[in-house]
Amino acid sequence: MLEVVTAGEPLVALVPQEPGHLRGKRLLEVYVGGAEVNVAVALARLGVKVGFVGRVGEDELGAMVEERLRAEGVDLTHFRRAPGFTGLYLREYLPLGQGRVFYYRKGSAGSALAPGAFDPDYLEGVRFLHLSGITPALSPEARAFSLWAMEEAKRRGVRVSLDVNYRQTLWSPEEARGFLERALPGVDLLFLSEEEAELLFGRVEEALRALSAPEVVLKRGAKGAWAFVDGRRVEGSAFAVEAVDPVGAGDAFAAGYLAGAVWGLPVEERLRLANLLGASVAASRGDHEGAPYREDLEVLLKATQTFMR
């Protein structure tokens, strides 16, 4: 039986090997990505039974996405190849650390998710449904899909996890806040970053007041993370790594925290696992290539007290 289901738009990323403007590049590496895809792959590598709901185009990039997810052991019962194209994006890293992303996803097969896109009984017995704020930003249909999926999860006693994952290229702060206001009553576990809190609400404190959920996890980058649970704040320290490619690190963080929750770990150890996964992905090229397997965890945590038993 599945433990986690994620849903969203798969993407393919084209990434230069060295910093500099894309216009001067001749070789680009190809990676499979997308926020919910990254979460699914990271969970599968940890041995969590995970399913992915989504659409890709009837094209070679869609075939690439499907092959990757199957190879990683993600359940694809409600994954479909559909008319249209698979979303694509290009990343550009400049020498002083700035980065830009160029999306080619509007009207993609993956952005056409709508209510009824999967049999809601697929959620029976699942521990978590995980969504991100990217999916509802893609289209009115995808926004309705996100709310519908959350409602179906709640009907079946499934906890809903939502990563704010705000993208200012997809929608405005006002639109994002409007969606969050509608979604929050059904959210059990909320992830957001300090940067997102400030962009959407002006101050972190205001965001935490507005975004009340039973469990809120604030990602603080190199400063680690805070989890607000049962009226207390739990702090988790970051792992010091040299960031090679930060894209996907937040998704890996969410996957680590979710895995810890599925395993019944205390909040402190969920944060530790989340920070470890985020650091591992940030230290590697690609959206999820650096996500560790469960058998790697004890080695990676050897420098500190490990929770593996």
Swiss-Prot record:
It holds the Pfam family PfkB. ATP binds at residues 165-167, 193, 219-225, 248-251, 275. GO terms for molecular function: 2-dehydro-3-deoxygluconokinase activity; ATP binding; nucleotide binding. Pathway: Carbohydrate acid metabolism; 2-dehydro-3-deoxy-D-gluconate degradation; D-glyceraldehyde 3-phosphate and pyruvate from 2-dehydro-3-deoxy-D-gluconate: step 1/2. It catalyses: 2-dehydro-3-deoxy-D-gluconate + ATP = 2-dehydro-3-deoxy-6-phospho-D-gluconate + ADP + H(+). The active site is at residue 251. GO terms for biological process: phosphorylation. Keywords: ATP-binding, Carbohydrate metabolism, Kinase, Nucleotide-binding, Plasmid, Transferase. The keyword Transferase applies. Belongs to the carbohydrate kinase pfkB family. Involved in the degradation of glucose via the semi-phosphorylative Entner-Doudoroff pathway. Catalyzes the phosphorylation of 2-keto-3-deoxygluconate (KDG) to produce 2-keto-3-deoxy-6-phosphogluconate (KDPG). This is 2-dehydro-3-deoxygluconokinase.
